[in-house]
């Protein structure tokens, strides 16, 4: 009892300490003046008080106008601004304009002095500091109770490159960057329509991360939009460093291995999903964009499916789904067959497997778990190592460990083949989030097969499908258009029909503008051949 009281007192003291720190932060915010002062000296002092001794915050005081009567201060953060813009479009025009009068300095600078596109006046300290942290420059003038915010964002950024996680043999070669505005502009180049709306907000009480919600007005479901806006407004956290934060805070189901939001770094993928009625969430500082509502079949679709012929795309999609289930159940089937159901194995194959396992001291389940864990370690090591040696380590390591394990009699050659086939099959899933889900579920199926044989495996598969059917992505059934079945949605699910036959958007996603193309879009080869023959006949007659 005393120990319990001591722990409770420690918890209460920690809660009280956290409450005191929170109250202290709120008190400091209250002490900061809401509006700027007409005194330039006070404004500079308030800025220094807020940013502390940060060496990258530049405060440059200059005197301009006739006889230097106007006293200004230009404040910006080095590294977040474009230095050429600061000097050529900000400092130089201010110094050269001698017509500026002290009584109307801010108004004159705003209206005619600066050639910058984005300049606006502001009085609120909160807004000014927020813009300063974004890379914009501030101009204060002595005797004026408002400052100017100048658009000077710049600094070093990664150039547009080919996506590294979603490589395509056909299609655009550009991927998203870490710049929010650049990513938005890349999507707008695909969808040149005023109904493509972008709503920006800031999340993270400390980081103040910019987030953009993008959708096509009139195509995206209004109920889904209302739901996602409510979930985004509810977010109250100190930092947002990557889109994964947002995904985990707004997804429908937390306790599931299956992803209920799709992420990509390809602008054409985002554009295609927006045109189907989905929305996208873009986070500043990351090239990965979130897309929802997400469906189970969506994770087996690749961008080049839509750039290739429908028959080729259909065959590859079916192959991906089959390979996905092979990666799920292959080790479990081997464990169940060799442990409980030897009568189902052909006699000659059973004799070969029995001869291989004669010197193996462990049961099949231990073999499977050991090799699976070893392959997962090698795969993780290959990802974390430098790219030059990572792939070599994973491949060579797998060969060496597999051969050594067989020679040592720890595992059988058949088990090495099964695990290797499973590892290769997992790479065929286009979406990494779905592939890693299979890697986790595979262990559950192996244990179920070791306990109950094929009965345990079948029970596990049934439970998995029941769980999949219970999932929702922003209210949309995760297994649609298969469950519930949709005749229109199934045209672009496990297989893809020709473009001329896919007249409407997916019913489970888009409730507004469902029609995406006109009727009678099917090409008429017979008529085309007739036209060609007619042209040839007319040409022959003219020649004679």
Swiss-Prot record:
InterPro entries in UniProt: Spore_Ger, UPF0353/GerABKA_families
Keyword Cytoplasm: no
Domain of life: Bacteria
GO biological process, any: spore germination
Keyword Flavoprotein: no
Subcellular location: Cell membrane
Region (Disordered): 1-36, 504-544
Membrane topology category: Multi-pass membrane protein
Keyword entries, A-Z: Cell membrane, Germination, Membrane, Transmembrane, Transmembrane helix
One cellular component (GO) term of this entry: plasma membrane
Regions of compositional bias (Basic and acidic residues) in chain numbering: 9-33, 504-523
Segments passing through the bilayer: 279-299, 321-341, 392-412, 416-436, 443-463
Annotated function: Involved in the germination response to the combination of glucose, fructose, L-asparagine, and KCl.
UniProt record similarity statement: Belongs to the GerABKA family.
Name of the featured protein: Spore germination protein KA
High-level lineage: Bacteria, Bacillati, Bacillota, Bacilli, Bacillales
């Amino acid at each position: 009892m005393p120990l319990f009281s001591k722990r409770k007192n420690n918890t209460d003291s920690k809660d009280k300490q956290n409450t005191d720190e929170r109250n202290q932060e709120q008190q400091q915010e209250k002490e900061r003046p809401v509006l700027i002062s007409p005194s330039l000296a006070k404004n500079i002092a308030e800025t220094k008080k807020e940013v502390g001794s940060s060496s990258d915050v530049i405060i440059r005081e200059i005197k301009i106008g006739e006889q230097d009567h106007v006293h200004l201060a230009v404040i910006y953060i080095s590294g977040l601004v474009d230095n050429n813009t600061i000097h050529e479009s900000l400092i130089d025009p201010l110094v050269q304009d001698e017509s500026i009068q002290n009584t109307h300095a801010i108004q004159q600078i705003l209206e005619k002095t600066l050639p910058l596109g984005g300049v606006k006046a502001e009085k609120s300290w909160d807004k000014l500091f927020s813009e300063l942290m974004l890379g914009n420059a501030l101009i204060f003038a002595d005797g004026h109770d408002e400052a100017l915010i100048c658009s000077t964002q710049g600094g070093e950024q990664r150039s547009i490159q080919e996506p590294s996680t979603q490589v395509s043999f056909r299609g655009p070669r550009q991927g998203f960057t870490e710049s929010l505005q650049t990513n938005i502009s890349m999507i707008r180049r695909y969808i040149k329509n005023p109904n493509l709306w972008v709503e920006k907000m800031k999340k993270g009480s400390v980081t103040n991360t910019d987030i953009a919600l993008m959708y096509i007005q009139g195509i995206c479901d209004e109920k889904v939009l209302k739901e996602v806006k409510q979930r985004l407004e509810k977010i109250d956290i100190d930092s947002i460093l990557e889109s994964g934060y947002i995904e985990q805070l707004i997804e429908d189901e937390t306790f599931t291995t299956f992803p209920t939001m799709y992420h990509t770094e390809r602008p054409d993928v985002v554009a295609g999903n927006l045109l189907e009625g989905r929305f996208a969430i873009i986070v500043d500082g990351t090239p990965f964009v979130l897309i929802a509502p997400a469906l189970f079949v969506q994770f087996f679709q690749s961008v080049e499916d839509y750039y290739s012929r429908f028959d080729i795309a259909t065959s590859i999609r079916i192959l991906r789904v089959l390979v996905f289930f092979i990666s799920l159940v292959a080790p479990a089937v081997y464990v169940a067959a060799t442990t409980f159901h030897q009568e189902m194995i052909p006699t000659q194959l059973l004799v070969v497997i029995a001869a291989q396992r004669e010197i193996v001291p462990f049961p099949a389940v231990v073999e499977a778990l050991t090799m699976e864990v070893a392959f997962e370690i090698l795969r993780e090591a290959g990802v974390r190592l430098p790219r030059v040696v990572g792939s070599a380590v994973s491949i060579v390591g797998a060969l060496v460990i597999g051969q050594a394990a067989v020679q040592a009699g720890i595992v059988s050659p058949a088990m090495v083949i099964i695990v290797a086939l499973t590892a290769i099959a997992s790479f065929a899933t286009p979406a990494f989030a779905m592939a890693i889900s299979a890697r986790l579920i595979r262990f559950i199926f192996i244990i179920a097969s070791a306990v109950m044989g094929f009965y345990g495996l079948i029970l596990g598969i049934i439970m998995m499908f029941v769980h999949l059917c219970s999932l929702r992505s922003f209210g949309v059934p995760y297994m649609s258009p298969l469950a519930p079945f949709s005749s229109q949605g199934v045209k672009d699910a496990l297989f893809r029909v020709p473009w001329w036959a896919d007249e409407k958007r997916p019913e489970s996603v888009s409730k507004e503008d469902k029609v995406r193309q006109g009727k009678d879009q099917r090409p008429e080869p017979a008529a085309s051949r007739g036209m060609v023959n007619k042209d040839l006949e007319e040409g022959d007659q003219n020649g004679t």
